[in-house]
Amino acid sequence: KECMTDETVCYIHNHNDCCGSCLCLNGPIARPWEMMVGNCKCGPKA
């Protein structure tokens, strides 16, 4: 399965599809509400 490259916005339904981790502004621990509003992006493995 293809993974989503860094800088791709990741949401709660697809955050596991990042090649690395789904990183939110407040740190690598993804907060569900931040994912819902599109504040998180794929980035390096946390």
UniProtKB/Swiss-Prot annotation:
Molecular function as annotated in GO: toxin activity
Span list, region Keys region for toxin activity: 31-33
Domain of life where this protein originates: Eukaryota
Coiled-coil regions listed in the entry: none
UniProt xrefs under InterPro entries: Insecticidal_knottin-like_sf, Toxin_28
Tissue: Expressed by the venom gland.
Disulfide bridges in this chain: 3-19, 10-22, 18-42, 24-40
Keywords: Disulfide bond, Knottin, Secreted, Toxin
Pfam family, one: Toxin_28
GO CC terms: extracellular region
Subcellular localization(s) per the UniProt record: Secreted
Free-text function comment from the UniProt entry: Insecticidal toxin. It inhibits insect voltage-gated sodium channels (Nav) by partially blocking the channel pore in DUM neurons from the American cockroach, not by acting as a gating modifier. The inhibition is only partially reversible after prolonged washout. In vivo, the toxin causes flaccid paralysis followed by death when injected into Heliothis virescens larvae. It also causes uncoordinated movements followed by full paralysis to sheep blowflies (Lucilia cuprina).
UniProt family annotation: Belongs to the neurotoxin 16 (SFI) family.
Domain remarks: The presence of a 'disulfide through disulfide knot' structurally defines this protein as a knottin.
Protein's UniProt name: Mu-segestritoxin-Sf1f
Organism per entry: Segestria florentina
